[in-house]
Design a protein with these regions (language model features):
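ATP-dependent carboxylate-amine ligase catalytic core
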Residues: 1-45, 52, 59, 118-125, ...
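Extended acidic/charged loop-beta regions that coordinate divalent cations
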Residues: 2-28, 65-111, 152-153
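Nucleotide phosphate-binding/pyrophosphate-handling subdomain across enzymes
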Residues: 10, 108-173
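Hydrophobic "anchor" residues on beta-strands that sit immediately upstream
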Residues: 19, 55, 164-168
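Structural signal for conserved beta-strand scaffold positions within catalytic alpha/beta enzyme cores
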Residues: 22, 58, 80-83, 158, ...
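Glycine-/small-residue-rich beta->alpha transition segments that form the dinucleotide
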Residues: 62
Length: 173
């Protein structure tokens, strides 16, 4: 993880990624960085550290990333957006059942069944889908991987108790 400005730069100088992703800009690092714009600037260090001709995916619904991105050198990198109106997007309502969520993605021909709960999990799956396709995985393999995903315990874990379900999302609470 990252807690301060410069940490990602240091890490990418040690191991330069071929592929990098920023899924969201939250408030987890506010005490060290000041605000969401500063968090986006620190997280975008990963783009600067990504190898030449590398792949960078970002959540186009983040106004902070949208603000920082034009200030960065993206030449010689493939930059792909995901989210509403992005290069990779959800093209249907997200449906829920006891197994998880189901949604359509604009770069797949078949609906995605994801063993996870929460609309944000569909959003998190989008860059994974794109990366898998970029690595030439077959659609069937991608869909099977998402359908058989095993989530960390206590992270949107559905527990059956008698005639009811409890959604346990208490990880690090």
């Amino acid at each position: 993880g990252m807690e301060n400005k410069g940490e990602i730069t240091q890490l990418t100088s040690i191991a330069q990624p071929d592929i990098s992703v920023i899924t969201s800009i939250g408030s987890a690092h506010m005490e060290n960085l000041g605000g969401k714009l500063q968090i986006a600037q620190a997280k975008c260090e990963i783009l600067e550290g990504t190898k030449e001709n590398g792949l960078f995916l970002y959540n186009c619904e983040s106004k902070e990333i949208q603000e920082v991105l034009p200030t960065l050198d993206t030449e010689n990198k493939k930059v792909v957006s995901f989210g509403q109106g992005g290069d990779v997007s959800i093209t249907s309502d997200i449906e829920y059942d006891k197994e998880g969520i189901v949604f359509n993605c604009n770069i797949l021909d078949t609906p995605v069944h994801l063993r996870a709960f929460g609309d944000f999990q569909a959003m998190n799956a989008l860059p994974c889908i794109y990366i898998a396709k970029a690595c030439h995985l077959k659609e069937e393999s991608i869909l099977n991987g998402l359908k058989n995903l095993e989530m960390t315990k206590m992270r949107t874990q559905l527990i059956s108790v008698k005639n009811a379900y409890i959604l346990d999302d208490t990880y690090k609470s």
